[in-house]
Amino acid sequence: MMKGGMGNLMKQAQEMQEKMQKIQEEIAETEVTGEAGAGMIKVTMNGRHDVSRVNVDPSVMEEDKELLEDLLAAAVNDAVRKVEETSRGRMEEATEGMNLPPGFKMPF
């Protein structure tokens, strides 16, 4: 490989790293809302998995404590799944056309 080719390759790698870092920052700021019990429990979290809001329909509080706990856990899990799906989708968009093997993890 010629010297210029290696320099170009390094430049492309640096540009990709900067692009991926920007996308990761955008994902961290993205908010998703997980739901359970047909929307009776809603949990909002960001891409860093920080929960910012929990909304509980008043009718759920009239039910038993165990049901409320189960619905809260389900809503949090739903929000986590949505964060992961959003992250995966954004990363796939960013690496589209790079011919990476399936499941390849970027080192940054």
From Swiss-Prot:
GO terms for molecular function: DNA binding. Gene3D superfamilies: Nucleoid-associated protein YbaB-like domain. Keywords: Cytoplasm, DNA-binding. It is found in: Cytoplasm, Nucleoid. Homodimer. HAMAP family: DNA_YbaB_EbfC. Residues 84-93 have a biased composition (Basic and acidic residues). Belongs to the YbaB/EbfC family. This is Nucleoid-associated protein Csal_1459. GO terms for cellular component: bacterial nucleoid; cytosol. The keyword Cytoplasm applies. Binds to DNA and alters its conformation. May be involved in regulation of gene expression, nucleoid organization and DNA protection. Pfam families: YbaB_DNA_bd (PF02575).
